Amino acid sequence: MEPSKMAPLKNAPRDALVMAQILKDMGITDYEPRVINQMLEFAFRYVTTILDDAKIYSSHAKKPTVDADDVRLAIQCRADQSFTSPPPRDFLLDIARQKNQTPLPLIKPYAGPRLPPDRYCLTAPNYRLKSLVKKGPNQGRLVPRLSVGAVSSRPTTPTVAPPQAVSVPNKVATPVSVTSQRFAVQIPTSQSTPAKPAPAATSVQNVLINPSMIGSKNILITTNMVSSQSTATDSNPLKRKHDDDDDDDDDDDDNDTM
């Protein structure tokens, strides 16, 4: 910088001239004029803080005035808080001596870089990756499935007839839910009631009525038809005896004519 900037003005305050002389004694000759103002501000703040701490220590010790011991104690406490200095050389030597007494770990016996075990290496990873399993949109919940074309073959389960279009001229049919009902109706083949009914095989006939003919309900009627074989065996026994008597009379008449 120019010499005019480094040289303090003659009409400057006495504190500024003292600070410039301190910088010159330390060998600092290249600086800006505002450096003097910054150094003066720092010195004023530092001295004020030290004197305030010394006054507190003096009042704590119940002294009438602040003496040099209070100022010295304040400087020592402020230096420990504001400034850091390296530890003493003797302290560092003691720590180094204790550390060097610990033997080094063994080297791994394989080819490659001769490094100590992983727990002693600073380059060893100290974390473990965990794989994230992403669930799909359909995983973890039940998906309903429709089975088309599966028809039950049980005889007792009624089947619903496929819907048929019925044209009505005056009234339009509304879609309704079709429900099936099953009624068992027994229809006898003859009016005569046998005296002793015998068990016989019956044939079951299923009659399916179109729901459009009767309404919104599908009625399944099961009729029990009695076979002809069972009716022949269940005839009146008195009638069979009368027929046998007639046959005997005819045989007697034939014998008389001969």
From Swiss-Prot:
Quaternary state and interactors: Binds TAF5 and TAF6. Component of TFIID and the TATA-binding protein-free TAF complex (TFTC). TFIID is composed of TATA binding protein (TBP) and a number of TBP-associated factors (TAFs). Binds N-terminal domain of p53/TP53 which is essential for transcription.
Main location: nucleus
Gene: Taf9b
Disulfide bonds: none
UniProt biased composition (Polar residues): 227-236
Gene Ontology CC: transcription factor TFIID complex; transcription factor TFTC complex
Protein family: Belongs to the TAF9 family.
Modified sites of kind N-acetylmethionine: M1
Top-level taxon of the source organism: Eukaryota
Protein name listed in UniProt: Transcription initiation factor TFIID subunit 9B
Disordered as annotated region, ranges: 227-258
Gene3D superfamilies tied to this protein: Histone, subunit A
Organism the protein comes from: Rattus norvegicus (Rat)
CDD domains per UniProt: HFD_TAF9
